[in-house]
């Protein structure tokens, strides 16, 4: 059974504090938008899908007990709080897309003469809560689509590397993209989970993912919890791993995908893609449609969040870097579309060059 990172009942929200894992499993109450902003910004909750869900549900928790004099005052409250939540971690596009959708709903309900203030509030709460279940369903579809894409590629490639006699595969993933990064099941880790369910996962390798160690702390925690055949490797071992272990595919998540397929993901993703290209290993990005930003033409336009120096210089309270050294700590890098084999979504797997046209048709834009 997969881990539960988000616990929600109407009026109540708790998140599993990911800063304490794997040593301690502790749920933290999120009582409103200010709490939501803090747990996102401090990375007590992380992963682009989970950020959006926790952000929106924190607003639902805050407005649930409140009474509003007018629909206009409710709409103003919604708009201001959503804009604030988007600022918590700006690289992940899911929160911005969710905020835009909810604000659009609030605007429509404000204009509707047959909708009362209580009705508007109820419909808004329903919409935020629906995101939770939709994310789980989308993740399962991503998992199935990605697993089939990998297995199909292996089956059609003569003498494919990374496979055993029964067609099982060895895969590599980076950062954390599982139940802890989503409402449940996962994106890239959802693909791996689906391979395991099909009996086609021979082995999964996960990187430590410095400096926050999401791979060592979180992905490894999930893999051990679910008893997957798994091995942790250092970030600096990826080239040696792909050379020595015959990995069939690399699968990573995404915080934002540009219209041309350029992908912003956890720092270190770009160099893994370069190494995968050199070794002829397919490199897949697994992401829901909400992570694809067609308004951004390329990765050059993606804002990259920079984190505090302390995250590099300390482990917990212990300094590991020489005092006085300067640090550069971008949380993400951008992998060029030319290095990406396919982008796995809940609606199918697309090559980067066909992404914009395909998504535009799917969404009827």
Curated annotation (Swiss-Prot):
* Sites marked Transition state stabilizer: 175
Query: Single GO molecular-function term?
Result: S-methyl-5-thioribose-1-phosphate isomerase activity
The record ties this protein, via Gene3D superfamilies, to: translation initiation factor eif-2b, domain 1, Translation initiation factor eif-2b, domain 2
Q: What class of enzyme is it?
A: isomerase
Q: What is its main location?
A: cytoplasm
Keyword Amino-acid biosynthesis in annotation = yes
* One GO cellular component, as annotated: nucleus
Its UniProt entry gives the catalysed reaction(s) as: 5-(methylsulfanyl)-alpha-D-ribose 1-phosphate = 5-(methylsulfanyl)-D-ribulose 1-phosphate
**Domain of life, source organism:** Eukaryota
Catalytic residues, per the record, are 255 (proton donor)
Q: Does the keyword Isomerase apply?
A: yes
Biochemical pathway = Amino-acid biosynthesis; L-methionine biosynthesis via salvage pathway; L-methionine from S-methyl-5-thio-alpha-D-ribose 1-phosphate: step 1/6
Pfam families per record: IF-2B
What this protein is reported to do is described as: Catalyzes the interconversion of methylthioribose-1-phosphate (MTR-1-P) into methylthioribulose-1-phosphate (MTRu-1-P).
This chain's protein is named Methylthioribose-1-phosphate isomerase
Q: What is the lineage of its organism?
A: Eukaryota, Metazoa, Ecdysozoa, Arthropoda, Hexapoda
């Amino acid at each position: 059974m997969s881990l539960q990172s988000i616990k929600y009942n109407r009026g109540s929200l708790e998140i599993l504090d990911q800063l304490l894992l794997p040593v301690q499993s502790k749920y933290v109450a999120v009582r409103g938008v200010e709490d939501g902003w803090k747990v996102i910004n401090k990375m007590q909750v992380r992963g682009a899908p989970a950020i959006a869900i926790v952000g929106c549900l924190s607003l639902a928790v805050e407005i649930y007990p409140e009474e509003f004099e007018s629909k206009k005052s409710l709409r103003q409250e919604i708009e201001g709080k959503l804009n604030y939540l988007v600022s918590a971690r700006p690289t992940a596009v899911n929160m911005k897309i969710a905020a835009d959708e909810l604000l659009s709903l609030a605007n429509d309900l404000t204009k509707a003469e047959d909708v009362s203030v209580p009705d508007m509030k109820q419909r808004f709460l329903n919409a935020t809560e629906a995101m939770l279940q939709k994310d789980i369903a989308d993740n399962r579809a991503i998992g199935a689509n990605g697993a089939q894409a990998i297995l199909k590629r292996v089956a059609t490639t003569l003498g494919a590397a990374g496979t055993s006699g029964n067609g099982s595969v060895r895969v590599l993933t980076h950062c954390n993209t599982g139940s802890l990064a989503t409402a449940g099941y996962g994106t890239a880790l959802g693909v791996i989970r689906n391979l395991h369910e099909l009996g086609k996962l021979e082995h999964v390798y996960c990187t430590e993912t410095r400096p926050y160690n999401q791979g060592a702390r979180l992905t490894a925690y999930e893999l051990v919890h679910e008893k997957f055949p798994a091995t942790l490797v250092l970030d600096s071992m990826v080239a040696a791993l792909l050379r020595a272990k015959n990995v069939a595919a690399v699968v990573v998540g995404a915080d934002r995908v540009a219209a041309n397929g350029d992908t912003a993901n956890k720092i270190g993703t770009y160099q893994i893609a370069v190494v995968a290209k050199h070794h002829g290993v397919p490199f897949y990005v697994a992401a829901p449609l909400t992570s694809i930003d067609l308004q951004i033409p390329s990765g050059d336009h993606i804002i990259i969040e920079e984190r505090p120096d302390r995250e590099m210089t300390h482990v917990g309270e212990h300094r590991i870097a020489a005092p006085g050294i300067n640090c550069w700590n971008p949380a993400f890098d951008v992998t060029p579309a030319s290095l990406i084999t396919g982008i796995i979504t809940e609606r199918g797997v697309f090559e980067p060059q066909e992404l914009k046209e395909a998504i535009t048709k799917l969404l009827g834009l």
